[in-house]
């Protein structure tokens, strides 16, 4: 309701508006046909196009190391998409994961309100302190990103989306995230709880 009200205020009856940017939510494009919407979207993506400097990474952690075995015991393995190891290897991306995690509602719903950034020396302690479901991903600083065996397609999609946004940022200090009250409201909204339960089956 608040979002719809905000959109209405922003438009203010202007019938010429065909693009609406919703902070931390996405973009709404209006058009007389699907082709018109597609054309507008292409113009937007062309203007915002930027080079991505990150590439595939592989982890250096040996499978017979105690840390690797500990991760396996908890149900984790190296993530399937090697690009996503950068989230645990590149300082700028680690900072995004740590400080700008709650970028948009779906991300919080499917991946939680904060990320688990693993420490090589304290990983066992970190995992033992979790009193709820284990997180779908662990970002082991300087090593790589690990996925839990129960991770769903929806959760993979959300992390890929986060990565696509993160690698295109020049100054993360300017990035707005969802507030604590917005996150609380979101995670306790019955409709979102139901939607998340459906996604876990995919």
Regions found by a protein language model. Give the residues of each.
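Glycine-rich flexible loops
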Residues: 1-202
């Amino acid at each position: 309701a608040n979002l719809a009200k905000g959109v209405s205020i922003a438009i203010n009856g202007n019938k010429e508006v065909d693009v609406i940017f919703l902070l931390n939510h996405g973009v709404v494009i209006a058009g007389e046909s699907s082709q018109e919407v597609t054309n507008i979207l292409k113009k937007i993506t062309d203007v915002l196009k930027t080079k991505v400097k990150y590439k595939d990474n592989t982890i250096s952690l040996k499978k017979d190391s105690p840390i690797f075995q500990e991760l396996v015991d908890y149900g984790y393995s190296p993530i399937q998409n090697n690009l996503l190891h950068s989230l645990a290897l590149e300082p700028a991306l680690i900072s995004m994961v740590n400080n700008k995690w709650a970028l948009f509602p779906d991300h919080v719903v499917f991946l939680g309100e904060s990320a688990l950034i693993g420490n090589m020396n304290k990983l066992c302690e970190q995992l033992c302190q979790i009193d709820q479901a284990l997180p779908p991903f662990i970002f082991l600083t300087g090593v790589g990103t690990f996925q839990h065996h129960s991770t769903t397609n929806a959760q993979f999609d959300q992390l890929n989306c986060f990565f696509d946004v993160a690698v295109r940022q020049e100054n993360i200090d300017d990035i707005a995230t969802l507030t604590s009250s917005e996150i609380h409201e979101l995670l306790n909204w019955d409709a979102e709880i139901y939607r998340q339960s459906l996604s876990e089956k995919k």
